[in-house]
Amino acid sequence: MKEIRGKKLKLLLKEEDIKRRVKELAKEIESSYSWEEPIVVVGLLKGAFIFLADLVRAFDRFVFVEFMQVSSYGKGMKSSGTIKIVKDLDMDIEGKEVLLVDDILDTGLTMKEIHDYLLMKKPKVLKTCVFLDKKERRKVDFNADFVGFEVPDKFLVGYGLDWGEYGRNLPEVYMVED
């Protein structure tokens, strides 16, 4: 059994199930945009980068890729609730069709705040996609337009999600056991 930082890991999502769902999501997303020009896919670093890389490679069309980095976790296992933009967009998204991508939606605070921030930049369309959704942790009324998997309220690692930088590179998603 795998362990991180002295805690056992229990498999939640297998690599093949993740790959299948990412391809399905790409098709769903593709059908929801006009594609008059490539959409701008904005990934939230660091957690979303693996999901985002697989997602954009599953599209049958060209996309522009942008990154933002926000901080709300620190080194713990719970969100601090304070959101800080560490890296902003390099590209102007005014009048563009945009997809905001993150690894996990739990309280909704980060996604809602970044979504509202991006709306101020006047995109033509702004939709959201998350790899994982912990609906039972929601503190604000915010739901993603596209969701990979709904997951239980457990601390998760793998496929981009980490615990103090550990576990991000795992190809599956695991629950950290108490």
Curated annotation (Swiss-Prot):
Its EC number is 2.4.2.8. GMP binds at K134, F155, L156, D162. This is Hypoxanthine-guanine phosphoribosyltransferase. Belongs to the purine/pyrimidine phosphoribosyltransferase family. Pfam families: Pribosyltran (PF00156). The lineage of its organism: Bacteria, Pseudomonadati, Aquificota, Aquificia, Aquificales. The gene is hpt. It comes from Aquifex aeolicus (strain VF5). Its cofactor is Mg(2+). GO terms for cellular component: cytosol. Purine salvage pathway enzyme that catalyzes the transfer of the ribosyl-5-phosphate group from 5-phospho-alpha-D-ribose 1-diphosphate (PRPP) to the N9 position of the 6-oxopurines hypoxanthine and guanine to form the corresponding ribonucleotides IMP (inosine 5'-monophosphate) and GMP (guanosine 5'-monophosphate), with the release of PPi.
